Amino acid sequence: MRAPRHLIHLILLILITGCTTVVNRVQLDRELGRPDPGRFDRPAAPPAEAPDYQTRVRPILERRCVACHACYDAPCQLKLTRHDGITRGANAESIYAGTRLLSASPNRLGFDAHSNAAWRDKGFHPVLNERAATPQANREASVLYRILALKQRNPGPDSGPLPGGRFDFSIDRPQTCTRIEGMPDFEKEHPDWGMPFGLPALSTAEHDILSRWIEAGAPFTPRPPLSAALRARLAEWEALLNGDSLRDQLA
């Protein structure tokens, strides 16, 4: 019995796609070195030219990205509210799967894995470069950089309705969580799917800040310590809200 033609075409497409991904991975390994999942577990001092994460990068992410990428069920489980959420990366597994009969292992930041290497073992793939620490590699091997650049090349309309048939905003839509090896094909097949998805592109200034930050290795800078006056004020509120008296409990 001969297989249906459409089934043969589907099998060939899967084989070709898989071969292309392998070829792209080998090329990346040859040109930029093999990935090191522990790269961001060993934070280095940020270069002087890198935009500061707390004061320049995080405000852009909060303003333009976290409306979608904040919760644990964010698209591709990519949490952009925290630096360790960015370095953890993406995972195509759906959090709320209606057909799942058994419970799934949770993926809570700070609880269920404590290194990026451990997150890789749980199925997460990087969206930042984990290969050679050079500006070129930080651009070419970063899903985040390339998907932001894709939006800059194909910004779409700033207002009015979007082109019909190009975007799917349904809650149960299939997730497309492309690894870096698949980005060349993704960029060709879905030129309109840059980030922010279905929304106006980042401004030139915003994109420049994020691009320079990624090129510099996406360094993290901790929050500055609280002042003594603010710590004292917080202690007063903690004492008030956690008091044992009936009056304190009523408050």
Regions found by a protein language model. Name each.
Residues 1-6:
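Positively charged n-region of N-terminal signal peptides that target proteins for export
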Residues 19-251:
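Aromatic- and Gly/Pro-enriched helix-to-coil junctions and flexible linker segments
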